[in-house]
Amino acid sequence: AAVITVGPNETVTRIADAARLARDGDTVLIRAGTYRGEVAVWTQKSLTLRGIGGRPVLVAAGQAAENKAIWVIRGEQVSIDNIEFRGARVAAGHGAGIRFERGRLAVRDCVFEDNEHGILVANFEDMELSIRDSIFRQAARGGPLPAHLLYVGRIARFTLEGSRFEQGHGGHLVKSRARVNDIRYNLIADGAGGEASYELEFPEGGDATVVGNVIAQGPATGNPAVISYGAEHGRWPVNRLRLAHNTLINDGPAQGPFLRAWFDRLPADARII
């Protein structure tokens, strides 16, 4: 496996060139700096992408790989560490910092700011997403659709740990359709200037464990409930929401419920624990 280093003083100066050069098992190191319009599609089966010497900032600057995102990920096993994604927008309203379409993706110590979606995930039931120690903030404004800071599709497993979400707009801070969700020790708080709907939503139920988080709705919320479970239907064989050791705060004007569980739309054996 090779190591490819990207930077203004390196042999490879453009991220898109690194995406074409990289092979399965390679590591791509991106030096700190601002990279404007450096969009890319990554299809290698196994790949490590890491910022070095500080956190590189990828600014969409009106560009989108495949008219989808700053980066499109379609590998079997990919890790992304220490990268910042900013300003993703497309005409359809689904512009993402990362569009994750196949395989298993691990995101660590990354920042997503001013995107229509921070990460947008496809619907394949063998996919897995893990996010740790990352920041999602300042959802894009003025787009044709609600902007979710994180939108997880119908995948096998979603893990979220040690991360921060703030300042949504129109959409939700965290929305997941995954079969299994493990959400621990995060700060999910809309805060000043935020106009999110739900802070945490599981529209199709699933097996969700939510432990040790601070989840807070702001005064300009678009929805009175903080957490929503099963608003559309129950898609998965296990529909169970486990809440433990969380701090829930509702500063919304309507003082709505901390949790709304849509039992009329879920199977009879759905449980809240």
Question: Which residues fall in each region the model found?
Answer:
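Acidic Gly/Asp/Thr-rich repetitive segments characteristic of extracellular carbohydrate-active
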Residues: 3-37
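Soluble non-cytosolic domains of exported or imported proteins
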Residues: 9-13, 74, 101, 237
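Short, solvent-exposed loop/turn elements at domain surfaces
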Residues: 13-15, 56-59
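Right-handed parallel beta-helix
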Residues: 50-56, 76-87, 104-114, 126-141, ...
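Acidic, glycine- and Ser/Thr-rich low-complexity intrinsically disordered tracts
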Residues: 26-29, 44-48, 57-58, 65, ...
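Extracellular beta-strand/beta-solenoid scaffold signature
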Residues: 61-71, 91-99, 114-123, 142-153, ...
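Extracellular beta-strand-rich solenoid/capping regions of secreted or surface-exposed proteins
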Residues: 23-24, 35-50, 57-81, 86-104, ...
